[in-house]
Amino acid sequence: MTDDATQRRRLEAGLAQIGLALAPAQIDTLFAYLALLRKWNGVYNLTAIRHPDEMLTHHMLDSLAAVPALAEAARAAEVGTPARGRVLDVGSGGGMPGLPLAIACPDVSVLMVDIVQKKTAFLTQCRAQLGLSNAAAHWGPVEKLDDASGFAVITSRAFAELTDFVNLSGQLLAPHGKLIAMKGVYPQAELDRMEAAGLMAQWQVDAVPRITVPGLDAERHLVVLSRRASAHA
C-alpha cells in the first residue's frame, strides 16, 4: 500500500497536470474525504474500488479532471441568479464528482442526489465532518426533486446513459445552463440513441471534449449539452 506522503505527492502532481491550484488546506480536506470513504466503504459498500491507490486515481483524480469544466460552466455569466454557481450531481453515490468539486471550488454550491439512503447519509456525514457549507445531499429520485431556482450545471458520473440523464434531470436545468455527463470512450451510440428518441429537437451537443486523468490509462470524455434556443421560447 502506498504511504500517505507518496499519495499526497501523486495528488499534487495530478492537480498540477489538471491545472487546479488548491491550497494545502483543500488538499488536506480531499484526503480527509478519502479517509471517510474508505472507512464507510468497509461497512456500507459505497464503491467496488477499495484499494487506496485506485481510489485516488479512479475516483478522486477522475472527478477532479472534470472540475475545471464544471466550475467554468457553473460560474458562467449568462446563467442568471439564483441558478448561477449551483451544480446538481445526479446519482452521486459516494460523492463523485460532487464532493471534490465542492472542496476545490468553495464558491460553487453542490447538491448531490441519490436514491440509496445509506449513500446520502454518508454524503451528509462528509458535509458535517469536512465543514463543507457549500455541499448538501438529497435522498430520492432526481425526477421528483422540487427546486424552483434551477441549476447552472447538472452533471453525472455513473448515473445513466444520456437519454435517461436528459429525460430525468433536464427539467431542473436553468435557462442557458449545461448538462455535463462524464463518460469513458466517446459515447457515439448513446448520442445516436438520443437522436433516435427525438431529444435533439430540444437539446444540442455543445462539445464532447476528451479529458486526461492523471495516472489513469483510459479514455474519458465530457458530453456538454444545452437546450436549443427554440426550447426556451
From Swiss-Prot:
Q: Which domain of life is it from?
A: Bacteria
Group of enzyme by EC: transferase
- Per the record, the major location class is cytoplasm
- Iron-sulfur recorded as keyword: no
Q: Which reaction does it catalyse?
A: guanosine(527) in 16S rRNA + S-adenosyl-L-methionine = N(7)-methylguanosine(527) in 16S rRNA + S-adenosyl-L-homocysteine
Localization of this protein: Cytoplasm
Q: Which GO terms describe its molecular function?
A: rRNA (guanine-N7-)-methyltransferase activity
Q: Which Gene3D superfamilies match?
A: Vaccinia Virus protein VP39 (3.40.50.150)
Residues that bind S-adenosyl-L-methionine: G91, M96, V142, E143, R157
Read off the Pfam families from this record.
GidB
As recorded in UniProt, its EC number(s) are 2.1.1.170
> What Gene Ontology cellular component terms go with this record?
cytosol
Keywords in alphabetical order, please. Answer: Cytoplasm, Methyltransferase, rRNA processing, S-adenosyl-L-methionine, Transferase
Q: What protein family is recorded?
A: Belongs to the methyltransferase superfamily. RNA methyltransferase RsmG family.
Purpose: Specifically methylates the N7 position of guanine in position 527 of 16S rRNA.
Please give the name of this protein: Ribosomal RNA small subunit methyltransferase G
The gene is rsmG
